[in-house]
Amino acid sequence: MPGIKVHPNESFDEAYRKFKKQVDRNLVVTEVRARRFFEPMTEIRKKQKISARKKMLKRLYMLRRYESRL
């Protein structure tokens, strides 16, 4: 869980910016949104399969693009 130490000479805005940056780095908000509703295992697998396909197609595109430059 994100947490920061506020120094005595630090303004609220600076501390708030630090906290927001730490929350973004730890992906807290995205995880909370993902867990907001129950998702069956079949849906999770389906999303993983789709993302794996997208990743593979992206790699294939980059490889073909690289080969065409040789």
Curated annotation (Swiss-Prot):
InterPro entries: Ribosomal_bS21 (IPR001911), Ribosomal_bS21_sf (IPR038380)
Gene3D superfamilies: Ribosomal protein S8
A single MF term (Gene Ontology): structural constituent of ribosome
One GO term (biological process): translation
Alphabetized UniProt keyword annotations: Ribonucleoprotein, Ribosomal protein
Pfam families in the record: Ribosomal_S21
GO CC list: ribonucleoprotein complex; ribosome
Source domain of life: Bacteria
Coiled coil ranges: none
UniProt similarity note: Belongs to the bacterial ribosomal protein bS21 family.
Name the record gives this protein: Small ribosomal subunit protein bS21
Species lineage: Bacteria, Pseudomonadati, Campylobacterota, Epsilonproteobacteria, Campylobacterales
Gene this chain is encoded by: rpsU
